[in-house]
Amino acid sequence: MILVGIDEAGRGSLIGPMVVAGVAIDSNFLKFLSEIGVKDSKKLTRKKREYLFGVILEYSYAISLVKAYPEEIDSENLNEITYRAMIQIIHSMSVYNPSIVTVDKVGNASAVEREIININSSPRVENNADVKYVEVSAASIIAKVVRDNIINELKKTYGDFGSGYPGDKKTVEWIKDLYSRQPTYALPIIRRSWKILQDIAPNYYIRKRDGN
């Protein structure tokens, strides 16, 4: 039985893209993946994630990735962007005729459920799916490692801005320093619609065009 798991990384980040990943895998491999430590990527060290990334690639039928960059995220509702990415992955995985497609739920996911049904699969759209289902944990790891690699490349160009999340003091200080030097130009790696910018870099802040 083929299963597909879908999850994202970087949804709440202030810097860099959101990465949505899908993994198609034979259910016979789930026990093995669980035994070697495949679980929610947030509970793993970077070294462990990178090791498991290679194992997941080896044992999966397919990996599908969709990236959403700050300009897109600043222009639309984040849930809608996430759903669109998930639907794109669902369509790309339909060739494998998955029995069940499991998605870590974000808001009202009825559109995602409909698309899963449209490819003749059973939808399993649940909160905390990345903790409960190995195939979603695998997708979480893929998304996280891919995003981490993108962040590392960005740091080579823009300097060490920490994790890129608004709760990271290093990220906040990097934004403040950048703002002190160039208050009228926000780098394209920054999500300008994040409200923290109203306090730390007000000229960078923009309201989303859809009002969200």
UniProtKB/Swiss-Prot annotation:
Keyword presence, Cell inner membrane: no
RNase H type-2 domain segment(s): 1-206
Cellular component aspect of the GO annotation: cytoplasm; ribonuclease H2 complex
Cofactor remark from the record: Manganese or magnesium. Binds 1 divalent metal ion per monomer in the absence of substrate. May bind a second metal ion after substrate binding.
Residues that coordinate or bind a divalent metal cation: 7-8, 104
Single GO MF descriptor: RNA binding
Residues in the signal sequence: none
Broad EC category: hydrolase
Cofactor names: Mn(2+); Mg(2+)
Catalytic reaction(s) noted: Endonucleolytic cleavage to 5'-phosphomonoester
Entry's Gene Ontology BP terms: DNA replication, removal of RNA primer; mismatch repair
Primary localization: cytoplasm
UniProt xrefs under SUPFAM superfamilies: Ribonuclease H-like (SSF53098)
Cell compartments where the protein resides: Cytoplasm
Keywords: Cytoplasm, Endonuclease, Hydrolase, Manganese, Metal-binding, Nuclease
KW Metal-binding (keyword) present: yes
E.C. no: 3.1.26.4
Superkingdom to which the source organism belongs: Archaea
The family this protein is said to belong to: Belongs to the RNase HII family.
Function: Endonuclease that specifically degrades the RNA of RNA-DNA hybrids.
The name this protein goes by in its record: Ribonuclease HII
Phylogenetic placement of the source organism: Archaea, Thermoproteota, Thermoprotei, Sulfolobales, Sulfolobaceae
